[in-house]
Amino acid sequence: MTVVLDSRKDFTLENLRRVSVTGESVLISPGAKKAIKRSRQSFMAYLDSDRTQFIYGTTSEAGQGASKRISPEQQRQLARSRSRVRPGGGFGLEYVPERVVRMIIFARLANYIEGNAKARPIEAQRIASMLDRPLPKLPLSGQVGAGEILPLAHVMNFLPEGETEEGEWMARINGSPVSSALLCDVALTARGHLSLATQIFALSVDAYAAPLTPYSASLVRYARNPHEKRALRNLRWWFKTSSHHGRIAHQAPVSWRILPAVLGAVEEAVAIAEETASISLSSVTDNPVYILPTQSEPLGRAISTGGYHNAQAAPAIDDINARFADLCTLADRHTMKLHSADHLPANLADPKGDGWGTGLLSFLQ
């Protein structure tokens, strides 16, 4: 199957999953091609109206040479000379997973689909076609440049050959689709990991014969935090067939009773990551970005921005890592308690059997 892109509304986590995990192709819709073409025409009219105005990387050089204006002929020469993107720096033996490279390519198209990349339709089609070709290897380490130019240079080095015109080469390597893709990769997997963790901790509650009262329905009504409510409901789902009989008469250890609170914190981190990923994926992050024509600005406008920096992605990923580390700590405490509880057999072995239970694990520590 093929994901059809008509506008930025089509840049969803589900479509990203189809492209990156299932390996589907991308098709630029006829309507989107027309919109991109109209935008390109209006940008060129804007550029030709005053070739001395500042448009980063178009009427000026890039990087440290941004203050140097160049003549119209030099502007055309600069565009032609950058038709082939040179690979960025990097070192080490590890590479970004191929699914994430596909995510980067998909996310890159968000700037193009409605014309904000100020490029011709052929440029968007070239990028989309990369998903049907051998993928570049993107080094995991050594990307120490400003913004995301270095990793994007690695990816865009694999673009099909073709000349670039004014304003197009910078659109290939500026913006922040890499951080967006990395965050989306976390967002696509985090909820599944949380669901598995919830199931495992519910099993631990039953294995320890802990009371079910800390997970009662009445607590769902009292909880003010919506994420804790959801965590509690998800945990309770696994106790639908659990019996209240045969459980310890006193309260369970702390690491069992705080499960709703800790799982609720993970729920919140996952929800934030999903929301932030969805926003990042469908955002325009080019630099310079082309503002489409309006009644007050009939030719549109090119503006230098900080679109190459996604300030939300790293904190969202860090929070996910921190919350899952909390679950690892809880799992460690549960494991210790399950092997030291007076009401459970040593090494969790069947007293009537001749097995070792988990005794062999002690040799692996």
Task: Explain the meaning of each model-derived region.
Residues M1-R51:
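N- or domain-start disorder-to-order transition segments that initiate the globular core
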Residues F54-E114, K137-L182, A313:
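FAD-binding core of FAD-dependent oxidoreductases
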Residues G115-L140:
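FAD-binding glycine-rich core of flavoenzymes that anchor FAD
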Residues L150-N234:
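Mobile "lid/hinge" segments at catalytic clefts and subdomain interfaces of large enzymes
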Residues A181, A217-R221, R301-T305, P345-W356:
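Short beta-alpha connecting loops at secondary-structure transitions
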Residues V205-T329:
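Accessory "access/gating" subregions that flank catalytic or transport cores
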Residues N310-Q365:
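C-terminal catalytic subdomain
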